[in-house]
Amino acid sequence: MANPTQIYSRDVKWRKGVMRTLVSELFANGRITTTLTRAKELRRHAEKLITKAKNPTLANRRICASFLRPTLVEEGKKDVLKHLFDTIAPSYAKRNGGYTRIYKLVNRQGDNAPMAIIELV
């Protein structure tokens, strides 16, 4: 399979914007449905941010804040950054990587694109 960043045929600004939105929604909801290529690219970004959040220094918090969108989590209207550092990262304290799981789905009916569900383990 080709490099996922080459498949989109879009510029860097568009790709980064889509990844920021998808990562923020994944952390807010726990699972999302997207295309397989986006899910594979999303996994890279999500796992790096969770690894940074496991060591809650000010520098790591600023790195994560610069990437995530200001999305609210429904539970108590917490910000997704606070949710990442207070809830998600401590639950993976003893886990060294492999924080996400990808399930393949049937192809989308309109354009036959391979679909997938990505979720936090």
Curated annotation (Swiss-Prot):
Gene3D superfamilies: Ribosomal protein L17
Protein keywords: Ribonucleoprotein, Ribosomal protein
Molecular function GO terms recorded: structural constituent of ribosome
GO biological process: translation
InterPro entries for the chain: Ribosomal_bL17, Ribosomal_bL17_CS, Ribosomal_bL17_sf
Listed GO CC annotations: cytosolic large ribosomal subunit
PROSITE patterns: RIBOSOMAL_L17 (PS01167)
One Pfam family recorded for the sequence: Ribosomal_L17
Source taxon at top rank: Bacteria
HAMAP family reported for this sequence: Ribosomal_bL17
Subunit structure and binding partners: Part of the 50S ribosomal subunit. Contacts protein L32.
Family, per entry: Belongs to the bacterial ribosomal protein bL17 family.
Protein's name in the database: Large ribosomal subunit protein bL17
Recorded name of the encoding gene: rplQ
